[in-house]
């Protein structure tokens, strides 16, 4: 992680103060529009990808619902996951992330500017509050990204257990579920290298509420995981990294 992150920072040495100052300004300022905040986040994401020698290949973006108020559920490979999707996606979204990220320089301000929420995975009561908050915001038209594994997989493109509780936000909001398959996004920060890498983000067809209505969240988790695994198996050898 160190080499590529250092390269990103060195190549953005003149831009970093501007970005950080604006993140501090935007993070908790409700008077600044969501679109303006997200424009800053995308600029940071775009510069990070370009200066970090990371090619992000996006597929299926047309599958994102035209109407806001949905939740995206990707597999989780590391810190680059969100940056990669920000780089691809022109539509603002928020993210639920583990509370440990709150202490990471700039990451806290980025998540706050996105309207994201920090979750304590060890506190079920707080977790339920976050799930309810996500559901309420999605009902109001905000889009969210939730990692159903809860933590990143440490086995490359192999998936960990999908926590059924993460899908309670969707069942409460009665919103479309958008599965996403992330491939090789662990490479930018998990390998001690600055060579060019190609990562893939596949947006799968959404699952409308009518399709999963009445299902248990464990069943929904299994369906989403199965669809993501299928796409990864079909595409993980598309590039030579």
Regions found by a protein language model. Name each.
Residues 2, 128-241:
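Non-catalytic C-terminal accessory region of glycerolipid acyltransferases
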Residues 19-25, 37, 51-52, 66-124:
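Catalytic core of membrane glycerolipid acyltransferases/transacylases, capturing the structured
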Residues 44, 81-84, 97, 106, ...:
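Hydrophobic alpha-helical segments typical of transmembrane helices
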Residues 45, 116-120, 151-152:
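Short, basic, glycine/proline-bearing loop/turn elements
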Residues 51-59, 126-128, 183-185:
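Short gly/ser/thr-rich secondary-structure transition/capping motifs
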Residues 58, 72, 95-96, 116, ...:
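Generic preference for hydrophobic
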